Amino acid sequence: MLKKLTTIIILTSCVAISGTASVKSDKNRIKDREQKIEKQLSSMSLEQKIGQMVQLEVNMITQFDQRYTVTALQKLSVKELSDIISKFDLTNEYDATLMVVSNGKPKSSNDYQYQCLSQAINYKLGFKLDKTKLQNVFQTYRVGSILNMLGGTCASEVDVWNKATNTIQEAALKYSGIPMVYGLDQLHGTTYTAKGTLFPHQIGMVATFNPELAKRMGEISAYETRACGVRWLFSPSMDICRKPSWPRLYESMGEDPYAASVMGEAYLKGLQGDDPNNIDEYHVGTCLKHYFGYGVPDNGIDRTPANVNEQDLREKLFTPFLKAFQNGAIATMTNSSILNGMNGVANKKFLQQWLKDDLEWDGLIVTDWGDIENLYIRDHIAASQKDAIRMAINAGVDMMMVPSQLNYGETLKQLVEDGCVAQERIDDAVRRILRLKYRLNLFDNPYSNDNKYPLFG
């Protein structure tokens, strides 16, 4: 399988997805959905609500052979490690003598190699979910979303994906009563599934200046992703890049706001379809990233600060996002770096004021991988993890891509009980999360069937 935007963006224009002129929606269906959301919200405990705001990586519910964890492998001698590498036929990829020093202790510079080796071994052993971890995550913590590829560094087959996502969904419904939404990065095709269709990265897509091709790329990517049982993509990347040294330039829409807006709109429509309030079984929910100003770091290094004047922010960097919001994008991911002195996950001006208040946008805001931690570990804006969570949620973040800790929900609960985060803010976040799940028809049809997608690959 293979209107021209004005230069001055008027932020007071309403782009609530349910009321946007450029998308098709059934008003009665929307009214019925909102009533269901309010009824469900009123019946949920604080623990249930906060659990919906947590997103964990799939490794948190995966079964690993303890003999081949990173810690276990790092304790082995050269001979012992060499024997394991040979046992799993990985001698062409790994050399034990280069990974272990003479005294038997691993070189700290080779930690990444041990991580990759551990993942490669577990992939060969076969992907397995851990039933105990599944029960714990959904019954104790009421987690609302899972993300990331299966099996570490290797792409899994379609049937493996389907079995995994259905098993996870079954556990979510059994223990929490609310379907989970599975999120995945698919920026240029079905990148995390064996035999899936791959396309050029977004910079190559935009370089065609052909919206129809961009739309077809989105349609094919959506079709094959749904074949895997995944309904939510962290795509498209609407970043404008004006720093050639930025290492993620290839993921971006390039430097021109108009080209990015037109091509991004076409790609989004291909991924999500014509009605963002009723996404069918051949399309996926989108998540714009990285809102916004991520692609113009001052020094060109990824996840580093940028300083941009207000006019350029509105005319250039915000423009592609605005166009996508107007065309039904149901979610957005925060900027992972600092823009004009404030980290993207704590920027209340951009998250709450510009997006939720001024535009009356009713979609979901999710952080990028582990970015709340950066508020206190990297940027020293927050005094602690608890303080960082407070800042992010109060700024307008709805879902926390944690992704590898179980304590976030409990910490947020303490913040609410201490009066540091308002109950209304929690309700707003959970309302948006439930709305996304209704838009993806997860309540009516939570499971997937790969037999419906014979054109995969």
Region spans (language model):
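Glycoside hydrolase catalytic-domain context in secreted enzymes
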Residues: 17-457
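Bacterial Sec-dependent N-terminal signal peptides
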Residues: 1-27
